[in-house]
Amino acid sequence: MYSKEMTEVKSRCLGAFVGLAIGDALGAPVEFRRRGMFTPVTGMRAGGTFGLPSGAWTDDTAMALCLADSLLHNPEFDVVDLLERFCDWMLTGTNTSTGKSIGIGQNTLRTLGNYRRTGETTAIKGGKRSDGNGAIMRLAAVPCMHWQNVEKARSIAIAQSQCTHHSPLSEGCCDLMTFILCQLISGKIWEQILPYPNKNNWLEEVSLLSS
């Protein structure tokens, strides 16, 4: 690949990952608040449920950094390494913006606790309790690492979801988002990506997103 093309790819990867953190920091002060109950977000601000300083990120970016660190350690995906990093974040505040883990969801707390007790690396299927967006919020590093091998990226995206959010909806959304990000990183535009045929037996809700 020509150096100019690779520079553009690196820029898109940077945009995907840094954009994740910026969006997280922008939304943190109004997280859990209903639409219309706060002034429009036009810049970084402090406060919110967790009393964070302006520009601070939440558990979503912290876990994204854990996933990125794990993939740098083993690009093929090491589930034990990832879960150990998640536990380190939960217990010691690694990869947080304030030195203390905040915002951990009940589903993630439950599954990491189960891993520490039993060594089980796959979250218990919890129905709608496992349908949260935690797994998709953190996955940017997967397409950034494996955008040239879309099937591998999609497989890892599903596997990392199963660590904490083991449900067809969460896994399908991670699969679809990773496919989209891989295509965008490679230089394709929306019109070349969607609609995408449902080849993976996604739930109807996920299929609607891809149409």
What are these regions (language model features)?
Residues 1-211:
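Structured, active/binding-site neighborhoods that engage oxygen-rich ligands
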